[in-house]
Amino acid sequence: MKELTNRQKMVLDFITSYIQQNGYSPSIRDIAKHFKLTPRGAHIHVLALEKKGYITRNPKNSRSISLVKRPETVSIPVKGKISAGQGIEMFELVDEEIEIPVRMINGYGNYFALRVEGTSMIEAHIIDGDYVILKKQYRIPNGQIAAVVFDNKVTLKRFYHKNDKVELVPENSSMSPIICDAKDVKVIGKLVGVIRIY
């Protein structure tokens, strides 16, 4: 199944709750009223949920939405490679997806995967060839592992922001931290999981 946007997840949660409380599905007008949308706007979200495989419905019946049993996995895009080292050129767009356990993500947000190249994160059990699952976000707390861009290169490191500097710390005791000006560093995602394919 495809990942949901925040609004699609909210609409799906509303449909689920409505069915549990009433024993039948909401109409497009019920959904529109709840979210303060036009009927057309609500219809677009329902069509997206149907296309992504979360619901089925009969367009000829206004209360015909049925929930599809949620799968144990979801597909997210693989955006390219990320260095677990000194950094590699910005990742290229790759037309690839990877299946991950649904429990790895909370349904909200934008998730993507990158394939790891290098050994700078081995003490965090992230090795060359692993896929790191990242939640797209631009700010993270100190001490979190993040995908960051600096000098037009992307790398995976533990992130520390101190005043006007950023310290990118490897999880490999044989390697040194990278220290850069904060203005030259951009966080692109927070690590939420690792997939290893044998």
Curated annotation (Swiss-Prot):
The keyword Secreted does not apply. InterPro entries: LexA, LexA-like, LexA/Signal_pep-like_sf, LexA_DNA-bd_dom, LexA_repressor, Peptidase_S24_LexA, Peptidase_S24_S26A/B/C, WH-like_DNA-bd_sf. GO terms for biological process: DNA repair; DNA replication; negative regulation of DNA-templated transcription; proteolysis; SOS response. The record marks A84, G85 as: Cleavage. Keywords: Autocatalytic cleavage, DNA damage, DNA repair, DNA replication, DNA-binding, Hydrolase, Repressor, SOS response, Transcription, Transcription regulation. CDD domains: S24_LexA-like (cd06529). It is an enzyme of class 3 (hydrolase). The keyword Repressor applies. Signal peptide: none annotated. It catalyses: Hydrolysis of Ala-|-Gly bond in repressor LexA. One of its GO terms (molecular function) is serine-type endopeptidase activity. The active site is at S120 (for autocatalytic cleavage activity), K157 (for autocatalytic cleavage activity). Its EC number is 3.4.21.88. Residues 28-47 bind DNA. Homodimer. Represses a number of genes involved in the response to DNA damage (SOS response), including recA and lexA. In the presence of single-stranded DNA, RecA interacts with LexA causing an autocatalytic cleavage which disrupts the DNA-binding part of LexA, leading to derepression of the SOS regulon and eventually DNA repair. NCBIfam families: lexA (TIGR00498). Belongs to the peptidase S24 family. This is LexA repressor. The gene is lexA.
